[in-house]
Regions:
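Terminal or standalone catalytic/regulatory effector modules within metabolic enzymes
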Residues: 34-54, 238, 247
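N-terminal amphipathic alpha-helix/helix-capping segment at the start of soluble metabolic enzymes
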Residues: 1-19, 66, 71
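Short catalytic helix/loop segments, enriched in acidic residues and glycine
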Residues: 24-35
Length: 248
């Protein structure tokens, strides 16, 4: 089995999802040297909402934060999340701004750039990808997972191929809503390994309580299972099993 490559997301998406990105740099610094010795493939430490929150709520310089984190993690590559053409903001930015921002992030300590577009529109990823490749960064193309009549396995594979053609070094299936079931995880991992052939990350959220099982499935080489009940029925069973009943 290939060696697992784990990206720790505690100080970026972990605290963004749980604490609205309010963790200050002083809260991170004491643990960073220990995290640096764990052996993570990368530590996601920047991007997403951290840039905005540093200035809007924490009175911190986001660039200084990045440099401080890198100083404490010399042995582990740092990663950031980019919203494609939106970078770390809430609107589309010009090609020049994308180019300069990505290269500035690389100079200040970022090596792995996980880039996604909420609509899986490859046009919103192109400028990021070109800048990352120019400055020698690792381009991880992210696929936004959701469920709808048009979001099929074939559509995700098609987008994954577009990311590969754009020069992606690895692929991330980004399940930001916690909707990816263990069964679908197994199918997607095997399909991506067979047809895309790039290193693959699964980014899970624990909204529906399925993340631990998904982690088992993506590391497994067991034969495929039959189609399980729908996610709605699975959620009902999970809620029923975990409901706290009053004592009698």
């Amino acid at each position: 089995m290939p060696r697992l490559q784990i990206m720790d997301t505690t100080i970026r998406d972990g605290q963004q999802s749980l604490w609205a990105t309010r963790m200050q740099i002083g809260d991170m610094l004491p643990i960073l040297p220990k995290m640096d010795r764990v052996g993570y493939w990368a530590i996601e430490a920047w991007g997403g909402a951290t840039f905005d929150t540093c200035m809007r709520f924490l009175d911190e310089n986001p660039w200084e934060r990045l440099r401080s984190i890198k100083a404490q993690t010399p042995n582990t590559p740092l990663a950031m999340l980019s919203r494609g053409q939106n970078l770390v903001g809430y609107k589309h930015y010009s090609r020049d701004i994308c180019n300069h921002f990505i290269k500035a992030a690389k100079r200040n300590g970022v090596h792995v750039f996980r880039v996604f577009d909420a609509l899986n529109d490859i046009r919103n990823v192109v400028d990021n990808a070109e800048a990352i490749k120019e400055c020698g960064g690792h381009f991880e193309g992210a696929i936004s997972y959701t469920m709808s009549p048009v979001h099929t396995l074939d559509s995700f594979l098609d987008y994954g191929q577009k990311l590969k053609d754009l020069g992606a070094d690895s692929i991330c299936i980004k399940d930001m809503a916690g909707m990816l079931t263990p069964y679908r995880t197994e199918r997607m991992v095997k399909a991506f390994n067979a047809e895309i052939g790039l290193p693959l990350h699964i980014h899970c959220h624990y909204v529906g309580g399925m993340a631990p099982v998904k982690n088992e499935e993506k590391m497994s080489s067991k034969p495929p299972k039959p189609e399980p009940p729908s996610p709605t029925r699975l959620m009902r069973r999970w809620r029923s099993a975990t409901r706290i009943r009053p004592s009698r």
